């Protein structure tokens, strides 16, 4: 019995630790881990199958193979625990020690660790300052290295010099034997490492760093300094990179399993260890035999190779292979990659108490319920049932309980019912792309074998019932059940965390039913009746006196919320009013929760409207009411859809009568363009662009005509007049309500299919004029197949890409958690409505909703405060702000948050998934990553929905005013008047604004270069008026001066080519690509100069630079040599490439490249300073552009000749303005315009991609990612801190260090912001565990080990890996409580120690008194 009690005492308590340190193990350390040396390569005896003594599975070293039993069987049972058998030497203990006891191999010759040799940059090379090539030659016995020059003359030989065999012999002959020491192999390298004096090296490098000026040297020194300093601080000795002892993994971690038929399955590691032991033993023998040097050398080399293979097979040379010719899996492979230790077993484990089954719809369930098959429940809840059976005394032992459950007696089912009540279970559907992919439900027991799922949660799970499967998990502990219920219950997760929209929105049939019931129709049965209340309406409807859609008047009582603080019915005040409505709406209004007005439902309920309805309900009536309301909507919807009995017939696809005419007109126009092309008025490219445009427009027209005919129908009203009303056509109703299908799809059914794209994305210029109702001919069908096939191929490829993007995003943000309420930041960003092309893309309300404002928001007229400083802006505030016409609001943002190693709640604002201010402990980083990653996958899976039908945006060619007001131009707008008196824009960044009578900006439009302005500044503008027009298909080059054109370098066949159109015979001059020219003319650039009547150059106003207009490649010259040119005349046209269809296929890589912060290929060049432009001396292929700033300093840019320069001589440019066209480089934006501009750029660009697909993501998620991309800074001047110039450090770390230095009155470090791509940012995190589990495991671990890094376990990932609660949510408070408790314990211990000390210092008599008082014996 005592032994049993001792056994219980043995259980190890939880070890509390706060950091994990990684380092290199010294030989002594390895020996201290070991339980004995492995001397033999044998594993087990072939006859007895028992482990061989001193072999790889030796029981003496690693422990017994059976619990409490020695190998020879002399000692068995618990009572001999801890005894070491004198016969076989095995300790009697648990067999599981074979999982933790290590052995070791004493190597006969030192061996270099391959990771420190070959992982780039080579750490050995760095420390020794030798090249990898040289070190390898020494290690693999091809060369000698000088360890000690000895007595050789000064300068003849230095430490670390490499010598070949011949040189060595020559030198030995020259200086005599034993004068100097040079060794081959790892011993030489080890001796070199031992002789390094690190402190002295560090001092000399620091001195060199200060002295040198070259960037390359600074970089090299800084790298080496970092490594050496790490050795200094971590106490790791460099020579430990060379191993003298090799640790042996515990045998249970490299098992040897007998298979049927007498064969064995074994881990590859055993093979690798065996080779090492064999070669090591052979080497020992050779050394004892004093074998010739060359043989020993070969054996040493083979030993080195064997150890290399064990550690990282295939890293150097050919990989070692087993009997079946496949490379063996080494220790390194065990930990890296998807199937390695980190990702396979630590970050995601298989879970017990789980099951999976097919899902079916459960329309009768409540939102928080799911149907669980009885058999499944019985299996999952077994332990609970056993427990209950025992407490009730039905079964006496667990074994009896098991029998009872297996026989499935009636009592078991009763107990199951009881156990399951209010015990939430979790359902998960793969792929789990966001946090709504796992939700908790209360199980209802059902017959059958399929799980029933509530229809409203399908949107969150992205589930449908075509065979999807879901997994069930059971939270076991009380805490787990509590968290599942409060945080994960489906009825507590009704909003999408990505955008704050409701996730429990009905779809498909339900929407159709609700829509059908809330439509109204003219002259319906019983139209014009008046009802006293809703009960009367129901009675009349059931009696068949009215139809659902009839227009009637009903007296309705609504309840308004008057007191938000009150409880129950006291919150509401009723008010009764007669409404003109339809029967269906009146009946439906019965399910509205109190506090919602009838107006909300008094309209046809389309999908968007229903979403708005649920959203309003959530904001006004709270969560509970909303969930009940959603459930009722669902029930009503299903019932109404059934009653409506909507069906589809082929006659419902009405082909518009005007289709023939539209297509004929389009064909005529196309023929017209063909003619123009024949006669040479347009180029083939222009003709193609126009043809595609014509057919695009024709398709839209047919679509519009079809929708007009489909959506309206003429009926007689009750006075006998013919009126138009919305049609009750089934297909139209489905699309209009948002239940199924879209206008684009109906267009393919009944309009025309339109333009199709080729597999490469270019548009085929002959459209499919037929639709599916008419049927396609063979050619049309063939053209369609491209799109369909491309869609499927895309889907397969994109799913993987999108998943990878999500993984990178999660990894970069995983440690970002809200850790405090308020950081006290006073800076933020000023939000305006997002306007593009004159249209408001995102209204101000959407951008500021759920953020915290900075400063009071005041009434524009009365100046009274309407929203005080530091308020979270909710719907009411935002509506008020919009109503007052305030058009910009300053709000706090994640990017300006001052919290270190986390965020504060105020800067983040509203938690979109819950609707209030974010809680401390919320893992906002992961939520952001999921919100951005999830639609990526969704969209990619949806590329093919419009089967390649070329859904391309029509090219804008003019600006129309959307509102009334006065026209203003921005300060950057420059205009010239041409000979016809038109105003031609010659600025690149000009904008037209429309302001209202109060001077508030209503809209803003970018006006491109070369556009014609139709109105003068300050002119009154009416909505719908055109402000400017331009040719969208070519870009002009416009003369700003008058004169006579004189061509320079415009030589046919040299710089320009005559393009004679084969068909028309007309010719134009086109500038040809420099690459296609002869060598002599490569650097020459065709230029048009302007000269006046006297033959002198026309000068640029205010300068002495002549006007010369450079022509870029592809420009078509429209003037002739010697022609008189007026101001504003077009000198040349540059055709714009045809558009490829855009679809998220382009989008996903675009998002990835933004987050990876890649510099685009032909990036725009931005002005680095504000100043005046001039052109310097040209080089061979480049032109030199000089910007002279106000202080007269010149900044030079070299720009390739073929690039279009947007500025000209004498122009003044502002810092950050574009000088050469191209996509912007985010790194430039950061350095020239700062963090705020960069964030705006990335947010806008990412949002553009998602918006194109109609996906809503809140800006703050993208800002969170940007914050993580900016989390490192580069030190430019270390001041008095411990950093090195050019070192990249964590921003929070630098701030902490600076605070410390400033507190001591010294100089803080100066730094530059650095933008890192998400992969780079993940790998450069301070936590090596997180980085190693992400990518490049070997490199990360090698670096961490050399540096002796410590991981403070701050992020989520590190904690998951070591098996702890994550420091977020409940885990954060748990951890804080533990910290407080530990601090308290420490303080208490100190207090007690202090008191004891004080007592010890007191006089002796008092001490005696104290003892007498307490009645205890004197401790002495």
Curated annotation (Swiss-Prot):
Keywords: DNA-directed RNA polymerase, Magnesium, Metal-binding, Nucleotidyltransferase, Transcription, Transferase, Zinc. Gene3D superfamilies: 1.10.132.30, 1.10.150.390, 1.10.1790.20, 1.10.40.90, 2.40.40.20, 2.40.50.100, RNA polymerase II, clamp domain, RNA polymerase Rpb1, domain 3. Its EC number is 2.7.7.6. Its cofactor is Mg(2+); Zn(2+). Mg(2+) binds at residues 464, 466, 468. Zn(2+) 2 binds at residues 823, 897, 904, 907. GO terms for molecular function: DNA binding; DNA-directed RNA polymerase activity; magnesium ion binding; zinc ion binding. Zn(2+) 1 binds at residues 70, 72, 85, 88. CDD domains: RNAP_beta'_C, RNAP_beta'_N. Coiled coil: none annotated. SMART domains: RPOLA_N. DNA-dependent RNA polymerase catalyzes the transcription of DNA into RNA using the four ribonucleoside triphosphates as substrates. This is DNA-directed RNA polymerase subunit beta'.
